[in-house]
Amino acid sequence: MRRAVVLNGYGPPELLRLEKVRRPTLRADEVRVRVLAAGVNRTDIEIRAGNWPIQKPQPFPYIPGVEVVGRVIEIGGGVKTLRQGDAVISMMMGMGGVRAERPGGYQEEVALRAADCALLSVDIDLFDIATIGLAGVTALAGFDFVGAGPDRRVLVTGAGGGVGSCAVSLGKALGTSIVAVTRDRRKADALARLGADEVVVAPPGEAPPQLPVVTGVVDLVGGAMFGQLVKALSPGGKLCFLGGTAGDAVSFSASSLMEGISMGGWSSEVLDGAALRSAVGRLTSLMRRGTLSAPPAAKFALADAPAAHHAVQRDEHIGRVLLLPDVP
């Protein structure tokens, strides 16, 4: 038996209950991982609330969580790439999420396909990489699209959240000038400390502020400001849509396309093991150089999963939210 956070129906955070569940039999291509940290993501919030229904005929009981960092404690008979004691990170690929092909990461132990894991070297702080985690992989995809480097100025919306704060840190690690947009004035100083060269406060319900001209936009918000983000792009600029916390229905002037701008998007649903290992390798390389630091993280015990979901919903913190199974 192992402890896990279980959801038995859609609704408020209080429906997340800590229960004892059976350990599944390990398949030949799987490893059993003792979870050190499980990231809490907006995806988990939307699924629990019923906004993003689980894509199974009988979705409950359901264990949330789309990313984990932990240590291998058992290996299947066919696994040749990992050993007991190895530190690994895994995310998406049917773990939790709407696909729910296997139980999610909100538990003490999780069974994962070895091919879905990225091995972590001994010099990497496991809690730092857990904090960067899926947010860092997502932000990296955004910069791959819009471009990074000393000749780039990139605007990041939703900069105070999990992915946004990682995008600010990652952009600076890649040598990019960063404009951070947040709706919460209380987060401005923290964003500057993360490396933002300029912070724009755009409170909800108020007229959008004047945005500076940028070469790229990493958009995590969507909604009413989207058209203004497009206008902020210099000729030939690029916008990457990574999430729509303010809604995915947007409008913009089509004439902007005549200035050579391009728009695209990325979803972590496209991740596979090879892509994960490549992204994690790039992120940990920056960590070793000392150029990429983990953003702040609020940490909760498994039993406090409801409080962790409330923390994400309230959006009062900056950075990420983690569940730590070993915290009593």
Regions found by a protein language model. Give the residues of each.
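Short glycine-centered segments of the SAM/dcSAM-binding site in methyltransferase folds
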Residues: A87, R153, S177, G237-K238, ...
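C-terminal capping/lid region of NAD(P)-dependent oxidoreductase domains
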Residues: R2, T291-P295, P306-P328
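Glycine-rich beta-strand-centered segment in the early N-terminal region that forms part
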Residues: R22-V40, W52-G94, L220
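Mid-domain Rossmann-like dinucleotide-binding core that forms the NAD(H)/NADP(H) cofactor-binding site
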Residues: A130-P204
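Short amphipathic alpha-helix with an adjacent loop that forms part of the alpha/beta core around
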Residues: P204-P212
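Glycine-rich phosphate-binding loop and adjacent beta-alpha segment
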Residues: M95, A224-T291, P325-P328
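NAD(P)H dinucleotide-binding glycine-rich loop of Rossmann-like/cofactor-binding domains
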Residues: P57, M91-G158
